[in-house]
Amino acid sequence: MFIKFKISNRPIAPHLLVYTPQLSSLFSIWHRISGVGLAFFFTTFLIFIRIILSSNFACNLLTLISFEISQWIIIYFNLFILLFLFYHLFNGTRHIIWDFGFLLDIKYLSKFSLFLLVSLSLILIFQ
């Protein structure tokens, strides 16, 4: 079998650069990335809360306030987390709908992708 591929001068497995990325595959990859990002954020947040509650609260609160985090950093961080959360929620809903076998036609795929992008844009605008 290996000789057959060697004779035809074809690669055994096609390279990723051969394919053009499809919107549904990009959204699936971004869904996984947003899930990892949310898991990292919530785990870090819970560990941070646990540390604050397990030790001297007033001392830790004064230390936290003394960091003097800029208001813009807090706003962008909240926006980033909100965007990840809603993207993961909307795209997860889409994956659940697909698991039930609905909206698998190409026209529905592109319409739902457009709906996802528009809804995330509206969240960014009205946040």
From Swiss-Prot:
State the GO CC annotations. Answer: mitochondrial inner membrane
Q: Which Gene3D superfamilies match?
A: Fumarate reductase/succinate dehydrogenase, transmembrane subunit
Give the transmembrane region(s): 36-53, 60-83, 109-126
> Bound how, and how many: what does the cofactor note say?
The heme is bound between the two transmembrane subunits.
The record gives the membrane topology as:
Multi-pass membrane protein
Sites binding heme sit at H88
- Cofactor(s) in the UniProt record: heme
Report the main location listed first in the record: mitochondrion
List keywords of the entry alphabetically.
Electron transport, Heme, Iron, Membrane, Metal-binding, Mitochondrion, Mitochondrion inner membrane, Transmembrane, Transmembrane helix, Transport, Tricarboxylic acid cycle
The listed locations are:
Mitochondrion inner membrane
Any idea which GO molecular function terms this record carries?
electron transfer activity; metal ion binding
Biological role: Membrane-anchoring subunit of succinate dehydrogenase (SDH) that is involved in complex II of the mitochondrial electron transport chain and is responsible for transferring electrons from succinate to ubiquinone (coenzyme Q).
Q: How does it assemble?
A: Forms part of complex II containing four subunits: a 70 kDa flavoprotein (FP), a 27 kDa iron-sulfur protein (IP), a cytochrome B and a membrane-anchoring protein.
Protein family: Belongs to the cytochrome b560 family.
What is the protein's name according to its record? Succinate dehydrogenase cytochrome b560 subunit
Top-level taxonomy:
Eukaryota, Rhodophyta, Florideophyceae, Rhodymeniophycidae, Gigartinales
